[in-house]
Amino acid sequence: MLYQGGVVLAPGNYKLKFVARENESGKIGTFEQDLSVPVSQPGKMALSSVVLSSQLVPVQKSSEVQTKTEGLRTKLASSPLEINGETIVPSVTRLFTQNQTLYVFFQAYYPEKNENKEPIEGNNLRAGLIFFRNGLQVNATPMLAPSEVDAKKYVASFRISLPLAKLQGGRYSVQAVVIAPGTQHSAFSRTYLALQYPPPSPSPTTAPANSPATGEGSKPQPQ
């Protein structure tokens, strides 16, 4: 079952705590995460949090989703994680393996006009990912067009996928970069992930030499 919750927050720093309870056994699981809601700066581009995932699922029917909201405005909002009939399932641990595909989602909130008072077209925005390890850049994606644009709200959504097979095991910081070509507007946001090292290859074992059985059920015969 997919649980979705919505709440409108004022700018500030928050700590979110999620609690899940299994009714039959009474077992409870919790997860905590810090959340920062920045102050909106008119005339400047900003990015959302960067969501990491290894799983895409078809959008569920409304009857299969429990939705909890606080306030009228949240009831009017749709899930930004749903694009083209698919939902990206965020990774809570941000721990991945090399045989997985990494799906990255984020949104750019762009101003209505550039520094020359000319309208900014959301479809012209471009975004890419840069991977850092131990402070050094080790990989980067091409700059890509948005997956979806809401021109009325000036929001461009990006969903980028890439296989993790080419990255070595370890900890990485992932930087999302968005630019508006031909303008001075750009923004970036960072998150972190851990990539598990592949399991060591099993060492070959040498079969023991054949010897007469002398264990229980077999006794040496007297000469």
Predicted features, each with a name:
Residues 1-223:
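Intrinsically disordered, low-complexity terminal regions enriched in Ser/Thr/Pro/Gly
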